[in-house]
């Protein structure tokens, strides 16, 4: 009896899961959109970008300081 109830609950859960994922037009495609984009274009990954340490020379246009703000071409 308990096994039958567990099977019924599992079937209902899987059916509901199927309907919930079918409602969205993309299904499960958009779960990890950024990671997929970074796999196609490794240049876009934030892990590949280098940053300038504190009190180092920086580029104020790209703001490439690690944990500081670029002020007059120095990370402060």
From Swiss-Prot:
Q: Where in the cell is it found?
A: Secreted
Sorted UniProt keywords: Calcium channel impairing toxin, Cleavage on pair of basic residues, Disulfide bond, Ion channel impairing toxin, Knottin, Neurotoxin, Presynaptic neurotoxin, Secreted, Signal, Toxin, Voltage-gated calcium channel impairing toxin
What the entry lists under InterPro entries is as follows: Conotoxin (IPR004214), Conotoxin_omega-typ_CS (IPR012321)
Which residue ranges make up the pro-region?
Answer: 23-50
Q: In which tissues is it expressed?
A: Expressed by the venom duct.
One GO cellular component this record assigns the protein to is: extracellular region
Which one Pfam family would you cite for this protein? Conotoxin
Give me the disulphide-bonded residues: 51-66, 58-70, 65-75
Q: In its keyword annotation, does this UniProt entry include Lipid metabolism?
A: no
Q: State the signal peptide span.
A: 1-22
Q: Which GO terms describe its molecular function?
A: calcium channel regulator activity; ion channel inhibitor activity; toxin activity
What does the record's free text say on domains?
A: The presence of a 'disulfide through disulfide knot' structurally defines this protein as a knottin. The cysteine framework is VI/VII (C-C-CC-C-C).
Summary of the function given for this chain in its UniProt record: Omega-conotoxins act at presynaptic membranes, they bind and block voltage-gated calcium channels (Cav).
Family per record:
Belongs to the conotoxin O1 superfamily.
From the Swiss-Prot or TrEMBL record, give the protein name: Omega-conotoxin-like TxO5
* Organism annotation: Conus textile (Cloth-of-gold cone)
Gene expressing this chain: TXO5
